[in-house]
């Protein structure tokens, strides 16, 4: 299911993504035929939100000694007051509530994109616990720019509001 979500939300060439899944390489960056190549998704500077998300994952692991999934990280970022957050002391983290300006669905989409970008890993054998990858740790130390893809609005849903202006990707 997670891989289907990643496929649906990915901003790159779908042909290349499918071939990669089956162990083949697509020689071009753009097939010119899939929905993403015909209508590239908007991108935006997601550096600040990526740093917040990655920092939250790091601080939860450091405080608790164990990892958690995307949902719990989102709850901490948005300042939710759940029994688990209070029990584990995650309401005392510096990242608690720093993302309250965004909806939970937005944070969940950001978390999934950080996994796709290789900044976080998920272990399906361990309830999809998030772990910082070496690239994610490097990003926290170096403050490199992170470009995220704006999610496509689903019929009947409002389009998410992000804090940075977006620009149309022409890859």
Question: Where in the sequence are the language-model features?
Answer:
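Accessory DNA-binding and partner-docking regions appended to nucleic-acid-acting proteins
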Residues: 1-3, 11-19, 26-171
């Amino acid at each position: 299911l997670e891989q289907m979500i990643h496929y649906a939300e990915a901003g790159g060439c779908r042909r290349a993504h499918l071939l990669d899944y089956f162990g083949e390489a697509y020689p071009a960056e753009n097939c010119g035929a899939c929905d993403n190549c015909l209508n590239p998704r908007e991108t935006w500077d997601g550096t600040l939100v990526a740093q917040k998300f990655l920092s939250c994952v790091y601080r939860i692991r450091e405080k608790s000694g164990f990892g958690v999934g995307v949902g719990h990280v989102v709850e901490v970022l948005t300042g939710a007051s759940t029994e688990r957050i209070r029990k584990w002391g995650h309401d005392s983290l510096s990242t608690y509530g720093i993302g309250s300006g965004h909806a939970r669905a937005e944070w969940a989409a950001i978390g999934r994109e950080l996994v796709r970008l290789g900044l976080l890993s998920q272990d399906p054998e361990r309830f999809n616990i998030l772990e910082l990858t070496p690239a994610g740790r490097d990003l926290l130390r170096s403050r490199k720019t992170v470009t995220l893809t704006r999610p496509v609005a689903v019929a009947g849903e409002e389009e998410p509001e992000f804090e940075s202006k977006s620009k149309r990707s022409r890859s």
